[in-house]
């Protein structure tokens, strides 16, 4: 669902409108409270006060709510991510402030818990190289992805591609009995004995589809992620990689919906 910049500006054209939105978003069923003039809080007839910014990303921030909201809008409207440098330019803040805002927004994008099921494609990739070069790829990071066809994705920054690591991630994130689609990597041969069904394709032999068996969905996600990291962020440290993986997983899992509203529901 497309949420345009014109709609955004009309809805959040002032600090008061932004604050009112946060209050209603966090306390939708609350009645009997009124806005305290000149303060960022609400109170009832008994004098009990509610501070809607408390325990949110906005608490104790010197950045205006309008700038925060606009930053969240930019993240929701972009397919390729938003760099701290771009936020600095758009918001007119320091680079340090822009980086912190971007970091906090990605924290809102952490992946939900819950098991994938049905037809699930499973694959791994390296940031900055290909698996054939794995032995030469010092300082490269591995990511594992599991995606339901026409459903959700779970993607994790993993320490290695050992059998135990991959099998553990499958057990933690995919419901038993699901149909898995993988490549020929040896670890996946073990899943049939663990309550999963499996079909595979031989990427090493240039086989990318065998009837219903393919990993094209997860490969498409990798392609988008790598293009975005390279084009928008240029490079991502291993320390912060999971937060960027979360960012693109969040967009994928909320495709077709209003990402801005989904993000604001997590503040």
Regions found by a protein language model. Give the residues of each.
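Residue-level recognition of single "structural anchor" positions
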Residues: 1-267
């Amino acid at each position: 669902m497309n949420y345009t910049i014109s709609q955004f500006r009309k809805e959040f054209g002032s600090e008061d409108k932004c604050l009112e939105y946060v209050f209603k978003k966090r306390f939708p069923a609350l009645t009997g409270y009124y806005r305290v003039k000149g303060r960022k809080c609400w109170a009832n007839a008994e004098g009990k006060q509610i501070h809607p910014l408390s325990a949110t990303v906005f608490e104790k921030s010197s950045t205006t709510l309008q700038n925060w909201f606009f930053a969240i809008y930019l993240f929701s409207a972009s397919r390729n991510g938003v760099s701290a440098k771009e936020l600095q330019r758009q918001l007119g803040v320091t680079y340090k402030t822009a980086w912190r805002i971007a970091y906090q927004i990605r924290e809102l994008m952490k992946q939900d818990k819950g098991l994938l099921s049905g037809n699930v494609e499973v694959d791994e990739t390296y940031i900055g190289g290909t698996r054939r070069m794995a032995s030469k790829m010092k300082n490269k990071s591995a990511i594992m992805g599991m995606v339901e066809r026409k459903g959700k994705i779970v993607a994790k920054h993993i320490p290695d591609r050992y059998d135990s690591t991959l099998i553990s991630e499958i057990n933690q994130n995919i419901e038993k009995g699901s149909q898995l689609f993988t490549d020929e990597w040896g670890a996946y041969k073990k899943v049939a004995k663990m309550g999963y069904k499996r079909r595979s394709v031989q990427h090493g032999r240039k086989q990318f589809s065998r009837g219903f068996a393919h990993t094209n969905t997860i490969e498409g996600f990798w392609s988008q992620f790598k293009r975005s990291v390279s084009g928008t962020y240029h490079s991502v440290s291993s320390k912060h990689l999971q937060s960027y993986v979360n960012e693109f997983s969040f967009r994928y899992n909320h495709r077709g919906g209003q990402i801005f509203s989904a993000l604001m529901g997590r503040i």
